Structure formats: structure tokens, C-alpha cells
């Protein structure tokens, strides 16, 4: 029997193993929902591949066509040709002694797998297999070969940058703990799972753990094939529940070797003491790396023991202790389960899924958790730590009976033993311990969750279920006893918000168990093992369970644009982890930056969550992403100010997001997870070169003066308008170093629509502040701003005319002299006392002699006696006739008859001021004034708009627009606008015909 070490290519649709009768289901954690009751195939397709079901449960690994590292197909008889070694060691991992590079030894009895030697062409790795195709029966490879080829070859493609890419964490091992993975039946899985690669084999940091986990998974699969025969092995596989990164390098002290996962002395002591399950990280863990696990013959545990490394033997002596420990822990667990009522368990299940989802939402879901998560029940969680730790161990022991849970248990022990490899700067390697601390669900709860998740998956396979953030009892956070809060890069299930000691809200160990994971991670990549998880970053809001690579949903661009403002402890370690893990040298093929990662801020974790929650505080410091110092912040300052925005697009040279595979999927660029809009992705897809990364950094560096944070400068607008700018402009502009982070929104849109024009349009060096100033300073009537300009239809002094007194001057004062009205005061027919009768004459007949002078219409003593009597009689008759007429009319008119006596002022009469110079009557004066004013205003507006429109690019079509000078710095992509642009001739003509009309002409070339 030959032992073969296997390299897992990150190739799409490379089935390393053809179809073998029996699956070595490499992940019993199959980070999705595998049925804990499915003992035959504990590594169900749902576990490994999220919610996508492979073609067959036996060949679920065959379904990893696209993005998982190696499609290890069901290997009933492990293939002899698989000599490639899975070894990716971080640069810092020199502590691993002999078996640092895990030889994925396969007990091969058949040659069903293709030679891996021929698979280099399909590998996405920048480098072919280096020293790793050593066919060694001993499954041991020197540490140097592993270190040289590990991260460059295996992990060049970060899973985040594209569906096939993997995140090479150079920092500590990121262990994906699906500690209690409620696994669903493999039938639930959807066909897209075929394109998924095996669960996140996160390069670099997770190599030891993943290799250990793969070996454990293979062992578990063998056990699954031999459930009846492998009960002891299942009991031994306490640590198989977690998914360990197969690329994680392992020592010769691998306790997981042989299916029989043996605990270290530290692990045994800790594992025996349920209260001390907060496994303290010991600095000796670097030496306690996982040894390569030889493949187990399907029927013989003895063969497995024979095939295992010599290091396994001392550990095998410890095996009989585990069943007892398991029984004790199971008893404790049963007691706890009895205490927990069934409805509480259901609530826990419902809550665990929501909490699993927020971490899984990390890279691409619009449904973003509220900021409330940042400080969510920290005190309650701190109180729950001890109980949850005991629950975790109890769950691990109970899960030992379940082949599905064996991998998770292996992961925890692997986490205990394995130390973070690459984080030399992080004083305490909390990576593995946080993973251990992740609570594991009770098997009953797993079964319930499994049923729920299966029902949900049947209903909707791609849509995430709504999630609440309330922590479930079973998932109560466990305290990480590590003293430093430099969060371990391996803290996979660890709540991003958790301090080093507390996971603020229960970490969802079922990373891919929920539908959300399949929704957000259709490729099934589990990134929690990858460096994506903020390894030193307790603050990352989500564990990156869901790959942003294939997320169908769009992350909220605004929230992604901002750096988080971690309110908890260790801001330095938080940002240090962001900056240091920003560089994944394998993606760019640059190993030099791998050392810079840990050296910048002392942090080792990626800043994972696209959900970067912050109070949106603008940083006064421009973000200078230096090409050499991969620090996210100003490399010279390396300030870890919380208020600093993390430059979303400042693609540090090795940021795992930079290398794009052109998959058309939202690949968050660099640390800030650029908005996953398809508009922005088009440009990123075009830029698959590593040169773009360096050029982006160079452009950022050259713009250090201009590079006011793209959220800074005066552009409140640039926050919205520059959403896709840095990604598109920096990626597309290899030659444009003058591109400022905040280019206008439309230029970025044009860049997205046409990548060819993006480089040209982005060459404008105007910053967002200049853009806003130009926008504000443009002529108010010009069409540059894209606004429709309206002008008054009448003269500008219209309000003056309204306010003039001519409207009001006659009111109640003007009397028409032609209208008959009585004098202001009546005489009461009183004869004047002193009349000179010699001067009197009758106005009617002219006589001067009369016995009595009577009153007439002209006043007293104007008529002679006869004329006066006749006149009075006539007046009476007329009045009588008038009253008669009024009596026959309506009563209102009769009583209103007084108004005929003209006591009412004439101005109130109906048509009194008909001839007055009121504005609504176009008298010649008004017409002339209004026309002149309107003509002047329209002409001025036309001139200004015409000049401005010609000076600036009018409606740049992205395909044809190569105009570099946007002098007005308005948006190069200007919408259609109707403005009052008119030539003087048109103005004259329109004013002559219609004085009050203004013709709005269409401005802009189409």
C-alpha cells in the first residue's frame, strides 16, 4: 500500500478523483447541513458544499467543480497517483518541525484518480507544484518545501476575489469550526454545488488545520463507510467536528493522525475538565501542529494505525481515555439538555441560524446587521462563558457518536494543538482557541435545525432566511482565555465583535448550515477558515462564511464604504489585523508582502466583514496605501485611528481581493469590500492582472497629496458618487496615477459601463472637493449641472408692479364725478337764514319773483314755488314707482336698493377699474417691460448655458467619450437636461411672437 500526498488544485471542475465507489467525504463538517443521523455518509454533500447538493451523495466531492481547492472525489481506494503534497505554510511558520507540510497520504489500492502531475495547467496557482509531488510512503515533507511553495502555489486565488480564489492568510491558522453543524441530507443540496470546491481550504494560515481536518474527514469517511466497525474511531474522532484547513501545516505531533484523533496532554487535561474548556493557548502549540493523517482502509482501523505516522503511536495509547471522557461529558450534556426545555432549544435553533447568517452574510448580502450587534449582550455572554464551554465539550463528546460531528471535534483539538503559524507579531495565538470556544449545537438541536433547514432549502435554495441577532442559549459565546486581544486569525466562529475573552453574541458554528450560506456562497466556499475571517479582528461583524465571490445579493455600498469603528477593546490589534492581513502574498504571487503583513500593525487578521459598521466618522488623515507597506492606513503614520475610514479600494499589493478571476461576481476589492454592484464588477473582471494591484497602489501613492480620504474633502456627495470609483478607476488605470479616490459618480459609472473609457475618464485629477466646488460654482442657468432651468414668464419687476400703488391708490378714495351722488352731508331742507333774495332765480323757469323759493336738484332755493312743487311731486312719484318695482323683485334686491344711492365707493363697483394699469391686463407699458426683461434674462441664460455646456463635456457617452478635460469637474456622464439654451435669433423670434413663452431646447449631444 502506497501512501500518497495529495495537492488539491484550486481549479474549476477539476475532479482530481474520478468517481470511486466510496466517498472519502473529506469534510465530515461539510460545512453545510449534513444530517447528524447520516452515519454512513457523515460527510454529506450539504456539509461540504453548503446548500448545493452534488450529483450523488457518494460523489459529493465531485461536485466541487469550480471553487473549492481540490475536488477530492469519493475515494474508495485512494489513488496511488496522488502524490502531491498539500503544503501551504505561512512565512512565519518555522516552528513546525518535521511534518509541517501535511502529506495527504491516501491508502491507495486503485488508480482511479488522474495524475496530479498533469493538473498544473488547470491549477490557478501561480506556481506549479514545488517539491510537493514527492511520493512518500511516510507522508513527510521538509518544512522548507512546504513553506516555499505553500502559499504561493496553493493559495494564489483568494476565495474572496473570485469564486475560485482562496484567501491566503499569512497570519495564524484560520480554522473553520462548524462546531455543531446541523447537517441536512445530501439530497437537499442543489446542483450548483457541483461547481463548489471543497469547503474553504483557506490557504496559508489554515494549512495545518485544514490538512488535519481533511485527514480527519477522510478518516471519518472511512469510518462512515464502516460505521459498524468504526464506533471506536468515532469516539476517537472527537475533534473531527470542525473543518480544518487541509493546507494548514502540521507537526510530527499530529494528534489527529489516524482517524483516532488523539488529544494532546494539554487537550486531554482540558478536555477532561469541562469547566476549563476555555482552552488556553500555549505558546508551545506551534510545535503541536497536526501530523499528516494517513488514509484509513475502508474496513480496517488496524490498517489505519499502521499507515499513520510514528508520532501517532504515543497518542494512540491515550485513546481508551476518550470514551470515558466522552461518557462523562455526555452525561453532563444530557443533564444540560434536560435543563434546557424543548422550546428553548427551538429558539436556539432559530436564533443560531440567524446568527450564523450574519457571519455568513459577511461578503455580499444586502441584509446587513444593525449596529446593535457591536455591543450585544457582552455581559450576558461573559456570564454564559463557562456554561457554554461545558456545552461545547459535551456537544463534542455527544457528537463523537455522529460521524458528522467527528470532524468538528477534530477541529477543536486541532485548534488546541495547532498554533497560528504565520502570526509572529501577535503575542497570543488565539486562533485555534476561539475555534474551540465556538459552541457546538446539541445533537437534538442539530436534528431540529436540520429539519428546519431542509424545509427552508426545499422552499428556497438561494435566498437567505431572515435572521435575528439574538444569541441562542446553545450558542452562548465562550470566553477565550487568551490574555491578548490580538485576535487569533484562526478564530473562525468567533464573533467578530468579541473581545479576546468574550464572544459578544453566540458564534454560529454552523457556518454553511443555513440557507444563507448557500445563498451568499453558492460556490459553497466556507471562508471562516480562510484569512477572511478577521483573525486578529474580533470586531469583524461577520465571519466570512459566505463567499462574496459568488454572492447574488448586493452588499450595501454605503456601509461597505466606511471603516468600522470598533467600540470594543484593542483598536490597535483590530486595525493592525486589518492592515497586516491585508496582504495575501499568494494572490499576487508576492511573498515579500507576507512578512509585511504581520509587521505593520501587529495584527494578523483580514478585515473581513463587508459590513463595516462605523459612526461614519470622516478621517482627517488621507489613506495612503503604500505599495510596499501593505498597511491599510497611511503607511508612514500607520495610525490605527478608529475614525479613519478604511480605504475600500486601496488595494494593498497583496490584498487577497485584488486578483480577480474575471468571474463577473462581486469581488470585494481590497480590505473594504468594495460595493458588490454588478456595475462596478465589470471593470474588476477586466482587471485580472497582478500589475493592477501594484498600479493601484502606485496610483494611490502618487496621489498621497491628493488622496484625501475619498470620504473626506468637502464632498458629502462623493460618499455616494464615488461608490465604485476606487475599484474601477484604480483597477482600470494602470497608467493613471493622478486618479483621485473621489472621482465623480458618473465617471465611475461610465468606467463601469465601458472599461476602455474608464481609464481615460478617470485620468481627470480633480478631487471630489473640486468636483463639488465646480458643481456649486457652475452657472445657475447653465445646463452643465444637468438641471432644467426655468425663467419667469413675465418681466423681472413683476413683483414691483404688483407692489406699486396704482392698484390701491383709488380704493375708497376715487369718485367718478360723472356718477350722480349726493353731497357728503345733507341739508335737511333747511332754508338758509341769510339769503340775499335779490340774487335768487328759478333754475327751471328763470323767474325772480315768487312767493316761495323751493328746493331743487341743484340745492335749496333754486326753484320758484311752482317749479319746486312740481319737482317735489315728480320726485315722490318716481320714488313710489321705484318702490313698487322693487317690491315685485326679490327681497334681497329690494333691501339692497340702498346701494343705488351710491354711498358705496365706485372702486368696489364691478367694472370700475377696468381701464386701470393692472398687470394682468397687458397694457403697452407692461408688455414692453415684460418682454424686454424676459428677453434679457433668457439671452443671458442662453449665453451662460451655451458657454458652460461647450466648455464641459456634454453628455459623455461612455463608449465614445475620451474627453480628459472635464474643466468644470462636473460629472463626465451628464444626464439629458432641458435648459433655456437659445440662440439670440430664436430668442428674438419667440419674444416677438409670444412675449410670455420661453422655448426650452434640448441641450446635450446624443
Swiss-Prot record:
GO terms for biological process: positive regulation of gene expression; positive regulation of sorocarp stalk cell differentiation; regulation of transcription by RNA polymerase II; sorocarp development. Keywords: Metal-binding, Zinc, Zinc-finger. GO terms for molecular function: transcription cis-regulatory region binding; zinc ion binding. InterPro entries: GATA_ZnFinger_Domain, Znf_GATA, Znf_NHR/GATA. GO terms for cellular component: nucleus. A zinc finger (GATA-type) spans 842-867. PROSITE patterns: GATA_ZN_FINGER_1 (PS00344), GATA_ZN_FINGER_2 (PS50114). Residues 71-86, 159-168, 181-190, 411-426, 528-539, 558-589, 662-680 have a biased composition (Polar residues). The keyword Zinc applies. Residues 55-116, 128-248, 381-499, 528-638, 657-800, 925-957 are annotated as: Disordered. The keyword Magnesium does not apply. Residues 55-70, 87-110, 128-158, 169-180, 205-241, 388-410, 427-456, 468-496, 540-557, 590-601, 619-638, 681-706, 713-785, 928-954 have a biased composition (Low complexity). This is GATA zinc finger domain-containing protein 7. It comes from Dictyostelium discoideum (Social amoeba). The lineage of its organism: Eukaryota, Amoebozoa, Evosea, Eumycetozoa, Dictyostelia.
Amino acid at each position: 500500500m502506497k501512501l500518497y500526498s495529495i495537492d488539491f488544485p484550486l481549479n474549476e471542475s477539476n475532479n482530481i478523483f474520478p468517481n470511486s465507489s466510496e466517498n472519502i467525504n473529506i469534510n465530515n463538517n461539510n460545512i453545510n447541513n449534513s444530517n447528524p443521523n447520516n452515519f454512513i455518509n457523515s460527510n454529506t454533500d450539504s456539509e461540504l458544499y453548503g446548500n448545493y447538493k452534488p450529483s450523488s451523495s457518494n460523489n459529493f466531492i465531485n461536485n466541487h467543480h469550480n471553487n473549492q481547492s481540490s475536488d477530492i472525489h469519493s475515494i474508495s481506494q485512494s489513488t496511488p497517483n496522488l502524490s502531491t503534497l498539500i503544503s501551504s505554510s505561512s512565512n512565519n511558520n518555522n516552528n513546525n518541525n518535521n511534518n509541517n507540510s501535511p502529506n495527504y497520504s491516501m491508502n491507495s489500492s486503485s488508480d482511479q484518480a488522474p495524475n496530479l502531475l498533469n493538473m498544473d495547467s488547470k491549477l490557478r496557482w501561480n506556481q506549479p507544484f514545488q517539491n510537493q509531488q514527492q511520493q512518500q510512503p511516510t507522508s513527510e515533507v521538509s518544512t522548507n518545501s512546504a513553506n516555499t511553495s505553500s502559499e504561493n502555489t496553493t493559495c494564489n486565488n483568494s476565495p474572496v476575489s473570485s469564486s475560485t480564489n482562496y484567501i491566503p492568510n499569512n497570519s495564524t491558522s484560520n480554522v473553520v469550526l462548524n462546531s455543531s453543524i446541523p447537517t441536512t441530507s445530501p439530497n437537499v443540496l442543489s446542483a450548483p454545488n457541483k461547481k463548489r470546491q471543497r469547503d474553504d481550504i483557506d490557504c496559508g494560515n489554515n494549512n495545518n488545520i485544514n490538512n488535519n481536518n481533511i485527514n480527519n474527514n477522510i478518516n471519518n469517511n472511512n469510518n462512515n463507510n464502516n460505521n459498524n466497525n468504526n464506533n471506536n474511531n468515532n469516539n476517537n474522532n472527537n475533534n473531527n467536528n470542525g473543518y480544518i484547513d487541509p493546507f494548514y501545516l502540521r507537526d510530527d505531533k499530529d494528534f489527529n493522525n489516524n482517524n483516532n484523533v488523539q488529544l494532546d496532554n494539554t487537550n486531554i487535561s482540558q478536555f477532561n475538565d469541562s469547566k476549563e474548556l476555555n482552552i488556553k493557548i500555549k505558546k508551545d502549540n506551534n510545535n503541536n501542529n497536526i501530523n499528516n493523517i494517513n488514509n484509513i482502509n475502508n474496513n480496517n482501523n488496524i490498517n489505519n494505525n499502521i499507515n499513520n505516522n510514528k508520532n501517532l503511536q504515543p497518542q494512540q495509547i491515550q485513546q481508551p481515555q476518550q470514551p470515558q471522557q466522552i461518557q462523562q461529558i455526555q452525561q453532563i450534556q444530557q443533564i444540560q439538555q434536560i435543563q434546557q426545555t424543548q422550546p428553548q432549544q427551538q429558539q436556539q435553533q432559530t436564533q443560531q441560524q440567524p446568527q450564523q447568517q450574519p457571519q455568513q452574510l459577511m461578503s455580499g448580502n444586502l441584509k446587513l446587521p444593525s449596529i446593535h450587534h457591536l455591543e450585544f449582550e457582552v455581559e450576558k455572554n461573559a456570564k454564559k462563558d463557562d456554561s457554554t464551554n461545558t456545552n461545547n465539550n459535551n456537544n463534542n463528546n455527544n457528537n463523537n457518536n455522529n460521524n458528522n460531528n467527528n470532524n468538528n471535534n477534530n477541529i477543536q483539538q486541532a485548534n488546541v494543538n495547532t498554533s497560528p503559524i504565520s502570526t509572529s507579531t501577535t503575542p497570543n495565538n488565539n486562533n485555534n482557541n476561539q475555534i474551540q470556544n465556538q459552541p457546538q449545537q446539541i445533537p437534538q438541536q442539530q436534528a431540529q435545525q436540520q429539519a428546519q433547514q431542509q424545509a427552508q432549502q426545499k422552499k428556497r435554495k438561494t435566498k437567505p432566511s431572515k435572521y435575528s441577532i439574538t444569541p441562542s442559549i446553545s450558542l452562548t459565546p465562550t470566553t477565550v482565555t487568551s490574555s491578548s486581544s490580538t485576535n487569533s486569525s484562526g478564530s473562525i466562529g468567533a464573533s467578530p465583535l468579541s473581545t479576546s475573552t468574550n464572544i459578544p453574541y453566540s458564534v454560529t458554528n454552523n457556518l454553511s448550515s443555513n440557507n444563507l450560506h448557500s445563498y451568499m456562497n453558492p460556490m459553497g466556499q466556507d471562508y471562516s477558515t480562510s484569512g477572511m475571517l478577521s483573525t486578529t479582528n474580533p470586531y469583524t461583524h461577520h465571519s466570512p462564511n459566505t463567499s462574496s465571490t459568488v454572492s447574488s445579493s448586493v452588499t450595501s455600498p454605503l456601509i461597505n464604504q466606511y471603516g468600522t469603528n470598533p467600540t470594543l477593546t484593542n483598536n490597535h490589534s483590530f486595525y493592525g489585523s486589518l492592515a497586516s492581513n491585508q496582504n495575501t502574498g499568494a494572490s499576487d504571487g508576492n511573498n515579500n508582502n507576507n512578512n509585511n503583513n504581520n509587521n505593520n500593525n501587529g495584527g494578523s487578521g483580514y478585515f473581513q466583514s463587508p459590513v463595516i459598521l462605523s459612526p461614519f466618522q470622516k478621517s482627517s488623515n488621507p489613506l495612503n496605501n503604500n505599495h510596499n507597506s501593505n498597511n491599510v492606513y497611511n503607511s508612514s503614520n500607520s495610525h490605527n485611528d478608529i475614525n479613519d475610514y478604511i480605504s475600500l479600494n486601496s488595494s494593498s499589493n497583496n490584498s487577497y481581493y485584488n486578483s480577480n478571476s474575471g468571474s463577473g461576481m462581486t469581488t470585494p476589492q481590497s480590505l473594504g469590500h468594495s460595493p458588490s454592484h454588478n456595475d462596478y464588477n465589470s471593470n474588476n473582471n477586466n482587471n485580472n492582472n497582478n500589475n493592477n494591484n501594484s498600479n493601484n497602489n502606485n496610483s494611490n501613492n502618487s496621489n498621497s497629496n491628493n488622496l484625501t480620504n475619498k470620504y473626506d474633502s468637502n464632498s458629502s456627495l462623493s460618499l455616494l458618487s464615488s461608490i465604485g470609483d476606487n475599484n474601477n478607476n484604480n483597477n482600470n488605470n494602470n497608467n493613471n496615477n493622478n486618479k483621485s479616490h473621489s472621482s465623480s459618480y458618473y465617471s465611475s459609472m461610465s468606467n463601469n459601463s465601458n472599461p476602455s473609457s474608464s481609464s481615460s475618464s478617470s485620468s481627470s485629477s480633480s478631487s471630489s472637493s473640486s468636483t463639488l466646488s465646480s458643481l456649486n460654482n457652475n452657472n445657475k442657468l447653465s445646463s452643465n449641472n444637468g438641471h432644467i432651468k426655468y425663467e419667469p414668464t413675465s418681466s423681472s419687476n413683476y413683483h414691483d408692479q404688483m407692489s406699486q400703488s396704482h392698484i390701491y391708490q383709488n380704493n375708497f378714495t376715487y369718485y367718478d364725478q360723472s356718477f350722480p351722488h349726493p353731497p357728503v352731508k345733507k341739508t335737511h331742507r333747511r332754508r338758509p337764514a341769510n339769503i340775499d333774495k335779490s340774487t335768487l332765480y328759478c333754475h327751471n323757469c328763470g323767474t325772480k319773483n315768487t312767493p316761495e323759493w323751493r328746493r331743487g336738484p341743484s340745492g335749496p332755493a333754486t326753484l320758484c314755488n311752482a317749479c319746486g312743487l312740481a319737482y317735489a311731486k315728480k320726485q315722490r312719484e318716481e320714488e313710489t314707482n321705484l318702490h313698487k318695482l322693487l317690491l315685485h323683485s326679490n327681497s334681497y334686491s329690494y333691501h339692497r336698493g340702498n346701494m343705488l344711492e351710491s354711498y358705496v365707493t365706485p372702486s368696489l363697483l364691478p367694472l370700475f377699474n377696468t381701464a386701470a394699469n393692472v398687470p394682468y391686463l397687458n397694457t403697452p407699458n407692461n408688455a414692453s417691460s415684460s418682454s424686454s426683461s424676459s428677453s434679457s434674462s433668457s439671452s443671458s441664460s442662453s449665453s451662460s448655458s451655451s458657454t458652460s455646456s461647450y466648455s464641459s463635456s456634454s453628455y459623455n457617452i461612455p463608449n465614445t467619450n475620451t474627453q480628459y478635460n472635464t474643466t468644470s469637474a462636473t460629472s463626465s456622464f451628464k444626464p439629458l437636461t432641458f435648459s433655456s439654451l437659445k440662440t439670440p435669433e430664436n430668442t428674438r423670434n419667440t419674444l416677438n411672437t409670444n412675449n410670455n413663452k420661453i422655448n426650452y431646447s434640448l441641450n446635450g449631444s446624443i
